[in-house]
């Protein structure tokens, strides 16, 4: 089948081909011929593209944004040009010139200036998102992500709100108690009335303390539950992200973004609820204050615009400085993780002083950024405090004037002053809450980098049946980035069930990329990858990977026992099965010499074991679930000759009854293969047996001569 990009030159359906490109970008299989057949009677206008998108599992929404808002649109998207054709709008390049990266079907990606793009674009976008993804581009991550968890605990949250409401009513009684004491008890010397009021006041105080304690407990209880649920959802999403996400980001940066969830949760379940409730209930206090004195109430209300004006001025400054602070903190986190992960290299090169200077410089930058945020927050709090003090002075001066004129009693003035505090204090707290909200907004933006990324979701994809082991690559092309060169170019390859195929070539020739496409770690830009005749683009990736055994150049071992590391894919495997896999990988002998044998606890990444020992455990782990397809990606390149000899000695048993793909630099590792594929520049340069390729005198023969010369 001809790939969609190749067809573009002869087929005018640019909208169809753009849809196919975006479907494959989202990990969905889309056949242009099939879509053309299904919608043959219609031209591929925007409406038809929407119908066809639904057929392949995409949601498409028409959108006509202003040019200035285009960088905020969820990309990539399909754009309509002024000639009625379509192209893919990939992204806006950062920088002052705001270059736009686009791609037309059948052409290489192109960068356009802003003016060129606006001259080309007709003003319409087709926004695309994977219909199966819970975090798709049409539903960006925002506060609504937390609604399901909040709704689940709505009864607890409702109880908190009810208690807060009762506490507000109790606080309304306090000024009235003081007014009665000052205007009735003190003036009339009514001691019995004072005793009754004191008992009632004491009961109110005790009841208020009890309700406050209950509310604090409910807050803590609800927060703990939300921590567990939201953290679990975030971690599950993180595990479902494609490999490309992690390759494009530093580990420390991702960890820093995950930690932002705590800030958001603290904001949602902290003072935000009570402060907002206090602000809403301030309307009741204001109504009561009007009953006491219209003039004094206007003095208090005159300060409210000042609070909001202060927030309006300082918020943009605070937001920018919070962005800088987060970026500095993420850089520190990433640098710390890099240092700890590469401590062997740091110490072996004796670059500790250089690393210390780098850390000191980055830490100083972070502290300076934090200080700049604190300065803005301090300025805001100082301004709010100043305004509140001026309000108190105004209330005292105007109120005293009213008392002297006998338009108010002293008790009423005291009660009014207490009521005004219930209005100004929530506003002051709201100003602090606004600062917290800006911090939360930054946290939402950073966490959105994770949660807005599409996942490898099974959705309605079919489960792959038990494999026989046939593999076919049909004119497959792939590039890691839209603006990068092809890592694979028009590769076609068939592997029969039970066949052992070696793949060799220079570094960067596309060997490992080939196996990653077979694992569906990446999705081909053009062409198809089929296993047992099934297009792996339309099956659940987990059902595929469960049936593959993969050994990389460096096997990662985890902080658990040797047995648990081997049985990672089959936790219920018997000891007999674990030992059988270890024997097959040549690991049983050295495992028995460990202090506790198979129950020996390994350090992080197998600290304490040699590279060859770690690799043999990795091979045993790949064999434990008896995969029908085994991929050895440079699995023996880092082994010493003795360890490699052990693996090669068992290779016949390892390959028995399964399809095996061996990626290797050492040609001796693939000499026993049924067929050897030679890669060069992302293409299949040669293919044949060891003897045939040597006789051909091509690239394989030259590589063989080079390695023979090095060995000599």
From Swiss-Prot:
Its main location: membrane. Pfam families: ABC_membrane, ABC_tran, Peptidase_C39. ATP binds at residues 505-512. The chain crosses the membrane at residues 160-180, 194-214, 272-292, 298-318, 367-387, 390-410. This is Cyclolysin secretion/processing ATP-binding protein CyaB. PROSITE patterns: ABC_TM1F, ABC_TRANSPORTER_1, ABC_TRANSPORTER_2, PEPTIDASE_C39. Residues 157-439 form the ABC transmembrane type-1 domain. Belongs to the ABC transporter superfamily. Cyclolysin exporter (TC 3.A.1.109.2) family. It comes from the Bacteria. Its EC number is 3.4.22.-, 7.6.2.-. Residues 7-128 form the Peptidase C39 domain. It is found in: Cell membrane. It comes from Bordetella pertussis (strain ATCC 9797 / DSM 5571 / CCUG 30873 / LMG 14455 / NCTC 10739 / 18323). GO terms for cellular component: plasma membrane; type I protein secretion system complex. InterPro entries: AAA+_ATPase, ABC1_TM_dom, ABC1_TM_sf, ABC_transporter-like_ATP-bd, ABC_transporter-like_CS, ATPase_T1SS_HlyB, P-loop_NTPase, Peptidase_C39. Keywords: ATP-binding, Cell membrane, Cytolysis, Hemolysis, Hydrolase, Membrane, Nucleotide-binding, Protease, Thiol protease, Translocase, Transmembrane, Transmembrane helix, Transport. Residues 471-706 form the ABC transporter domain. Involved in the export of calmodulin-sensitive adenylate cyclase-hemolysin (cyclolysin). NCBIfam families: type_I_sec_HlyB. It is a multi-pass membrane protein. The gene is cyaB. GO terms for biological process: killing of cells of another organism; protein secretion by the type I secretion system; proteolysis.
């Amino acid at each position: 089948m001809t790939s969609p990009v190749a067809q573009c030159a002869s087929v005018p359906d640019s909208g169809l081909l753009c849809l196919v490109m975006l479907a494959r970008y989202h990990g969905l299989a889309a056949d242009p011929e099939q879509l053309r057949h299904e919608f043959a009677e219609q031209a591929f206008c925007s409406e038809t593209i929407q119908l066809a998108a639904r057929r392949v599992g995409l949601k498409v929404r028409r959108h006509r944004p202003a040019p200035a808002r285009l960088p905020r649109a969820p990309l990539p998207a399909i754009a309509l040009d002024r000639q009625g054709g379509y192209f893919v709008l990939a992204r806006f390049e950062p920088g002052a010139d705001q270059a736009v990266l686009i791609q037309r079907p059948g052409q290489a990606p192109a960068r356009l200036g802003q003016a060129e793009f606006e001259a080309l674009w007709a003003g319409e976008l087709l926004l695309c998102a994977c219909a199966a993804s819970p975090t798709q581009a049409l539903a960006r991550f925002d506060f609504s992500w937390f609604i399901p968890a909040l709704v689940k605990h709505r009864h607890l949250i409702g109880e908190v709100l009810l208690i807060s409401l009762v506490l507000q009513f109790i606080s309304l009684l306090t000024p009235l108690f003081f007014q009665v004491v000052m205007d009735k008890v003190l003036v009339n010397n009514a001691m019995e009335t004072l005793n009754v009021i004191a008992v009632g006041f004491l009961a109110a105080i005790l009841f208020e303390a009890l309700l406050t304690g209950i509310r604090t407990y409910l807050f803590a209880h609800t927060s703990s539950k939300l921590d567990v649920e939201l953290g679990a959802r975030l971690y599950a999403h993180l595990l479902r992200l494609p490999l490309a996400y992690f390759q494009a980001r530093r580990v420390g940066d991702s960890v820093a973004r995950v930690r932002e969830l705590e800030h958001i949760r603290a904001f949602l379940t902290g003072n935000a609820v009570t402060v907002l409730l206090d602000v809403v209930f301030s309307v009741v206090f204001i109504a009561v204050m009007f009953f006491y004195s219209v003039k004094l109430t206007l003095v208090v209300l005159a300060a409210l615009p000042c609070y909001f004006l202060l927030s309006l001025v300082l918020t943009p400054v605070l937001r920018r400085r919070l962005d800088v602070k987060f970026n500095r903190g993420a850089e520190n986190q990433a640098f710390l993780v890099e240092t700890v992960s590469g401590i062997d290299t740091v110490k072996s090169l004796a670059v500790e002083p250089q690393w210390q200077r780098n850390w000191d410089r980055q830490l100083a930058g972070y502290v300076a950024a934090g200080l700049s945020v604190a300065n803005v927050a301090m300025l805001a709090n100082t301004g709010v405090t100043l305004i509140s003090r001026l309000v108190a002075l105004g209330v005292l001066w105007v109120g005293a004037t009213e008392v002297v004129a006998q338009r108010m009693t002293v008790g009423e003035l005291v009660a009014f002053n207490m009521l005004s505090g219930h209005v100004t204090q929530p506003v002051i707290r709201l100003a602090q809450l606004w600062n917290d909200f800006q911090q939360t907004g930054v946290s939402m933006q950073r966490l959105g980098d994770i949660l807005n990324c599409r996942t490898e979701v099974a959705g309605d994809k079919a489960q792959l049946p038990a494999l026989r082991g046939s593999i076919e690559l049909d004119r497959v092309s792939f590039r890691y980035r839209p603006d990068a060169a092809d890592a694979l170019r028009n590769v076609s390859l068939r592997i029969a069930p039970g066949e052992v195929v070696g793949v060799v070539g220079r570094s960067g020739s596309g060997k490992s990329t080939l196996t990653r496409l077979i694992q569906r770690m990446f999705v081909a830009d053009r062409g198809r990858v089929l296993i047992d005749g099934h297009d792996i683009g339309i099956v659940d990736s987990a059902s595929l990977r469960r049936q593959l055994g993969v050994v990389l150049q460096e096997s990662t071992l985890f902080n658990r026992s040797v047995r648990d590391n081997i049985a990672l894919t089959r936790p219920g495997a018997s000891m007999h099965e674990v030992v059988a896999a270890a024997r097959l990988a040549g690991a049983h002998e050295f495992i028995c010499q460990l202090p506790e044998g198979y129950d020996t606890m390994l350090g992080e990444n197998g600290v304490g074991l040699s590279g060859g020992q770690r690799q043999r455990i990795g091979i045993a782990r790949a064999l434990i679930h008896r995969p029908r397809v085994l991929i050895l990606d440079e699995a023996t390149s880092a082994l010493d000759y003795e360890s490699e000899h052990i693996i090669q000695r068992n290779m016949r048993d390892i390959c028995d009854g399964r399809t095996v793909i061996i990626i290797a630099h050492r040609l001796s590792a693939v000499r026993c293969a049924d067929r050897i594929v030679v890669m060069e520049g992302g293409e299949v340069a040669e293919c044949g047996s060891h003897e045939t390729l040597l006789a051909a005198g091509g690239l394989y023969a030259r590589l063989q001569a080079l390695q023979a010369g090095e060995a000599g």
